[in-house]
Amino acid sequence: MASQTIEILVEGGKATPGPPLGPAIGPLGINMMQVVEEINKKTADFGGMKVPVKITADMDTKDFEISIGTPPTTALVLDELGIESGSHEPGTEVAADFSVEQAFKVARMKFDDLLANDYKHATKEVIGTCVSMGINVQGKDGRETQKDIDNGDYDDVFTQ
């Protein structure tokens, strides 16, 4: 059984047979409309966000399997805040303010993809992404909030 795998980013619920999906899967000889329909069905909850999709096609039978990843952490943070982009000058310009509770929510969504072994550390990883995006957490630089988490200031958030 020879199989080929393609990984691609598509907008949740809005995959089309055009680029970038069409040119990537066209040469595989699988039914493109079935692929598009299944991707749209599986990514409908991530509307407006770029979602990683993995398509594995059996070259002999032309069967395919689609697995959906979670959107990048940056996309989840932006969606949670309801903004288009982070700061264009992180460190000098603040784009928005995020709460530890919001960071925890994103950490739960991304937990399987993160390196952390518990939600506290996963939340700190999400806060690190916020720092890179020019987004404050709890009204201050995310690095300070990470220290506060280490000191136990937000332990009540992680025991919910």
Swiss-Prot record:
Q: Is rRNA-binding among the key words of this record? A: yes
Query: What GO biological process term is on the record, naming one?
Result: translation
What InterPro entries is this protein classified in?
Ribosomal_uL11, Ribosomal_uL11_C, Ribosomal_uL11_C_sf, Ribosomal_uL11_CS, Ribosomal_uL11_N, Ribosomal_uL11_N_sf
Q: How does it assemble?
A: Part of the ribosomal stalk of the 50S ribosomal subunit. Interacts with L10 and the large rRNA to form the base of the stalk. L10 forms an elongated spine to which L12 dimers bind in a sequential fashion forming a multimeric L10(L12)X complex.
Name the Gene Ontology molecular function terms of this record.
large ribosomal subunit rRNA binding; structural constituent of ribosome
Q: Name one GO cellular component term.
A: large ribosomal subunit
The role this protein plays is: Forms part of the ribosomal stalk which helps the ribosome interact with GTP-bound translation factors.
Q: Where is the composition biased (Acidic residues)?
A: 151-160
Q: Which domain of life is it from?
A: Archaea
Q: What is the organism of origin for this protein?
A: Methanosphaera stadtmanae (strain ATCC 43021 / DSM 3091 / JCM 11832 / MCB-3)
Q: In what ranges is there compositional bias, type Basic and acidic residues?
A: 141-150
Designated name of the protein: Large ribosomal subunit protein uL11
What is the gene called?
Answer: rpl11
- Keywords tagged on the record: Ribonucleoprotein, Ribosomal protein, RNA-binding, rRNA-binding
User: Which stretches does the entry tag as region Disordered?
Assistant: 141-160
Key word Ribosomal protein present: yes
